[in-house]
Amino acid sequence: MKMKTNMKKLLAVLMMLALALGLLAGCGGEKTASEGGNETKPVKIGILQLMEHPSLNTIRESIIEGLTEAGYTEGDNLEVDYQNGQNDMTVMKTAAQKFVEGGCDVIIAIATPAAQAVLSETTDIPIVFAAVTDPIGAGLVDSLEVPGGNVTGTSDEVSAEMIMNLAEEITPGFQKIGALYSSGEDNSASVIANLKEYAAANDLEVIESAVTNSSEVQQAAQYLADKVDIVYSPIDNTVASAMAVATEVFNEQKIPFYVSADSMVQDGGLATYGIDYTVLGKETSAMVARILEG
């Protein structure tokens, strides 16, 4: 089943509040930012982002904006050390060590591998993650209600079933679903497992094309293009960073490409029910502010 050439590009973004996990009882610390006009030393926050791409950048920018709204301003009572993880675990672990040695009050980790890297380096400094699809499966928290340890954060989980229901509304009658994702991202693995369960229950076929880095996305997309009716990609940072090449392939073959983030639609995907990453960033910043305030 091919998408009609005159089909208008659709954006079906569900404006969802991020799932804010319970704050840790032990995460509060002595407030060091100015309070009531009293000058004290700035609070120090480390931000580790998996890689640079629109979704993650939006989260980081919204976190900083949210902290400013909460009264924490860079150059005044807030010091921010931002590190780009370059999608490399060695780089991320080095950055996490830098945060620990530098005495950060809170560490913010954007995306699953970044959070895992930070957690491997400290069990004392409060860690607030953002854009982690499956915090339990990733080994970050014990439960969503009571995270445990020094970790809390916001989740961007969107079930594959929701996206498939959307696909059935827009492009009904598909039988073969292409799954384009990174084999190295735990967040993608859990969603693809959900997709397979949905497919089995609905007599549909899933054809997988997994990548290990963004340079493989074009070839993976070409592999799927002549085998499937639609393609689905979860909230996958590797695919998100290479949306231009993926959408070029699928547009040429007129294959509907469903994604799981609003920014991925803006970068060429057909449609999504997804997280508003500006809202998620603000929710994350609110959690950080509460920790700083003790």
Where are the regions that the model predicts?
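Hydrophobic alpha-helical segments within soluble ligand-binding/sensing domains
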Residues: 38, 135-176, 275-293
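Beta-alpha junction/loop-to-helix N-cap segments that form part of ligand/metal-binding clefts
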Residues: 85-142, 236-251, 255-260
